A protein has these predicted regions:
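Conserved redox-active cysteine motifs that mediate thiol-disulfide chemistry
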Residues: 35-52
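Loop/turn elements at helix/coil->beta-strand transitions in domains of secreted/extracellular proteins
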Residues: 26-31, 60-63, 88-91, 123
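Structural microenvironment flanking redox-active thiols in thiol-disulfide oxidoreductases
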Residues: 47-86, 98-105
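Short, internal strand/loop/helix patches
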Residues: 82-115, 123
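A short beta-strand-turn-helix
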Residues: 10-31, 54
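Short pre-active-site segment immediately N-terminal to redox-active cysteine/selenocysteine motifs
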Residues: 29-31, 36-39, 71
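N-terminal targeting signals for export/organelle localization
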Residues: 1-13, 126, 147
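Thiol-/selenol-based redox modules, centered on thioredoxin-like
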Residues: 115-147
Length: 147
């Protein structure tokens, strides 16, 4: 029996105009925004660390947002099954905006566009990282914001 199980959970897709408010929330929380894709091995390797942060620090006012740069044609074949397989609990959104010359520098002036990339911010304090994290490194960065 080869019935295909269709992933029915809602996957919100944003362009930059839709994403921009989500990466500039003005409240007391520490916001962690990670840009990743299922085809990016270093991204996949560090996803459990973001899940750990989400699980461990959500009660301390830390909010994790995973922004997938997977191609739209792969949402059903790769992204949704990946989220289901690894039981991702953090909020995942898909980002689809072909105007890279606009949104890459808008997200951060020093960003080359390479992933993984992460923004951690709280109010006006903002850090941008174009690199991978170990679990320990990511936790240290979060704790710096929570001080």
């Amino acid at each position: 029996d080869n019935d295909v199980i269709v992933d029915t959970f809602k996957l919100d897709v944003y362009d930059y105009d839709g994403l921009e408010p989500l990466i500039n929330i003005k409240d007391d929380k520490v916001h962690v925004v990670n840009f990743w894709a299922t085809w990016c091995a270093p991204c996949v390797k560090e996803l459990p660390y973001f899940e750990y942060i989400n699980e461990t620090f959500k009660d301390k006012g830390v909010d994790v947002l995973l922004v997938s740069l997977d191609f739209p044609k792969n949402y059903d074949s790769k992204l949704r099954p990946f989220i289901r397989k690894y039981d991702i609990k953090s909020k995942v959104i898909a980002f689809d905006d072909t105007d890279q010359n606009r949104w890459i520098p808008a997200i951060h002036k020093d960003w080359s566009g390479a992933i993984p990339a992460t923004i951690i911010y709280q109010g006006d304090k903002r850090q941008f990282y174009e690199r991978s994290f170990t679990k320990e490194e990511l936790e240290i960065e979060i704790l710096r914001f929570l001080r």
